Amino acid sequence: MKKYLLIVVFALAGVSASAQFGVSYHQSSIPNLGFNFEYQDRYFAELRFGPNQYFEHLALELTANYIFLNKEDYDFYGGIGGRTTQLEGLVIPAGVNIYPFDNKNFGFHIEAAALLGETSVLRGSWGIRYRFGGTRIPSPQKDE
């Protein structure tokens, strides 16, 4: 499974020239640090690492997500992916990104993800998200 994750990561590097890079932290009983590429304002792939663990137990998770509802201050997404090591198997995330500030690069997220494998778990998480580069949706112009 790790070989497949590496292949997908290198394939995503090819589209990174037209993608927006971001980072996220998912706080839960199974926390994750994520690195993502957002492509064409509708798709994003996220590679997640499970911190707070020994290296031999480090869990890798890769998800491909589609943004179903894309508004100025929030978006709703869902996807599918896989997870290695701890709770190995299929991952089905669904969540909301909220961008409440004028700077739409920084925001918060809430996510529920089904982890399906030998043991099935429903993981709920919340956290922060930051997108590098230009804003995806410009802030509304204020009349003076």
Regions found by a protein language model. Name each.
Residues 69-76, 101-106, 135-144:
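Short loop/turn motifs that connect adjacent beta-strands in outer-membrane beta-barrel proteins
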Residues 20-35, 48-60, 72, 82-91, ...:
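Solvent-exposed loop/turn segments connecting transmembrane beta-strands
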Residues 92, 112-114, 140-144:
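Outer-membrane beta-barrel porins/channels
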Residues 20-22, 30-32, 96-98, 106-112, ...:
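A membrane-pore/channel beta-structure motif
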